[in-house]
């Protein structure tokens, strides 16, 4: 099962994965019928934060701050009395990234006083060091805000979730609990006793960083849209996660839908009741001309893990202009742009959703565009964020699908415009070309 494998296991045949798992037989994009049974087993509100484990939180956080336009909002480190780990919170709109690195265990080896305890109660020196050694820079926790973290944990475990950290109440205000998601990644539940606490602070033990001491960066990124995992076998992972959360299947793609002549994947998306918490999961396809990019990830990551984070922008053109300015000076690089023919055919594919000037800007910035029967998706992918060809970031903007809630307030439905099914082949080609450059250099070496 994906969440249990520390090492990479080869599928004998890609049909052995999701197709053989009870309740999850992939039928492909064209035959899949989207339904929302509103089957969550506990009340889910939204994504709360993403925690990265790293070797040095200060420098990694600074790079993400500069590259994504996220401001330093809170800290828990030696200066706040935390002798266990350094943690720095970056925010942009509702998006929260937390970067955590261990201090020497000897600092807190004796009697730990309240002023020296870890702000993240589940933090463990050995686990963090082992994680970083095995995976390099990566996501440790996908945190979702729930109505009651203790209840969510109990229900999850009762429905097959593997416990990672039992519920802990912080300052009689916030409850945190964790279960295993896949690989060494955990699904973290966060709940607040009172709404005013939720709005006033991130977590107890963190001190706010005043605006005056944080350079006011903002490139237009507003929230986390979806968090994607890679596993050796899709079926068991889907059965496991859907089994303890109750999340329903929102979309699916098979190698026939999204592969190239050289490689492919199978993928399915799990969603919460309001479809604002989206968890796609991928598996590699074997027996193709080239090794699947998912298999490459699994080998370099030493097992299952989080592949990429899709960040929602309110203006993708502004976001990309700002990010590309910084690509060569400490920011993030992007995958190669598609050929000119892609943009010549774009008007035919997306209709009047984008003006001619906007299509021209998409070409200049390398933005991919796709649409489904409900809305339009604009997207672009970075190259891997660190030394290994593993985790990367997707910047997206969704257009359309506007709804009204019971109070008449407008909102955009989750997953509007789909997941770029029409762009998968372009993305695969660019990743294949990127991997070929690495292989060529390895052969020369």
Swiss-Prot record:
Query: What processes does the entry annotate via GO biological process terms?
Result: L-phenylalanine catabolic process; tyrosine catabolic process
> Where does the record place Polar residues bias?
1-11
- Give cofactor(s), names only: Fe cation
Q: In which pathway does it act?
A: Amino-acid degradation; L-phenylalanine degradation; acetoacetate and fumarate from L-phenylalanine: step 3/6; Cofactor biosynthesis; prenylquinone biosynthesis
Q: Which Pfam families match?
A: Glyoxalase (PF00903)
Q: Where in the cell is it found?
A: Cytoplasm
Q: Where does Fe cation bind?
A: 226, 308, 394
Q: Which SUPFAM superfamilies match?
A: Glyoxalase/Bleomycin resistance protein/Dihydroxybiphenyl dioxygenase
Q: Which reaction does it catalyse?
A: 3-(4-hydroxyphenyl)pyruvate + O2 = homogentisate + CO2
Gene Ontology CC terms: cytoplasm
Q: Where are the transmembrane segments?
A: none
**Highest taxon, organism lineage:** Eukaryota
User: One GO molecular function term?
Assistant: 4-hydroxyphenylpyruvate dioxygenase activity
Gene3D superfamilies per the UniProt record, alphabetical? 2,3-Dihydroxybiphenyl 1,2-Dioxygenase, domain 1 (3.10.180.10)
Which UniProt key words apply to this protein?
Answer: Cytoplasm, Dioxygenase, Iron, Metal-binding, Oxidoreductase, Phenylalanine catabolism, Repeat, Tyrosine catabolism
Q: What class of enzyme is it?
A: oxidoreductase
Main location as per UniProt: cytoplasm
Q: What sequence ranges are listed for the domain VOC?
A: 46-192, 223-383
Q: PROSITE patterns this protein is in?
A: VOC (PS51819)
- Residue ranges of the region described as Disordered: 1-20
Might you give the EC number(s) for this enzyme?
1.13.11.27
Do the record's keywords include Metal-binding? Answer: yes
Q: What NCBIfam families does the record tag this protein with?
A: 4HPPD
Subunit field text? Homodimer.
Q: Which family does it belong to?
A: Belongs to the 4HPPD family.
Name of the protein in its database record: 4-hydroxyphenylpyruvate dioxygenase
Q: Which organism is it from?
A: Arabidopsis thaliana
Gene that encodes it: HPD
